[in-house]
Amino acid sequence: MEHPEQKLQEKLRKFLASRLKPEIVWMASANGGYRDPHTAVSLKSMGVLPGAPDLCFCLDNGRTGWIELKAPGGRLSPQQKGVAARLIRLNHFWGVAHSIKEAVDIMRPWNVFKDGADLNEPREIEETEA
């Protein structure tokens, strides 16, 4: 079974590896994908939040930036919409991206990229991975 959102996340990780400032801390959430009921209950008991965005970036201004990755045509679940509204209300950054380019556009105002980083190369990864 193909997982387009997982593939997008892997491509984005590769793209960001050489472009983010070294002091930026970022991580992926444990959400996403199908889980058997036992695993889902276990993860929830450990604090995994249904609807949490896929990626979190700790920014130099004390705020966080969050990105929900979606396959082309993918839509937000009600839980994802609820978490997004809460994050925005708490004055954090949040966005949904269907491509590397959209993720980069969301992240530009966050001041996370190295000076001079080439952000116009998203196709390089998409083409080499195709």
What are these regions (language model features)?
Residues M1-A130:
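Catalytic phosphate/metal-binding cores of nucleic-acid and nucleotide-processing enzymes, i.e., regions
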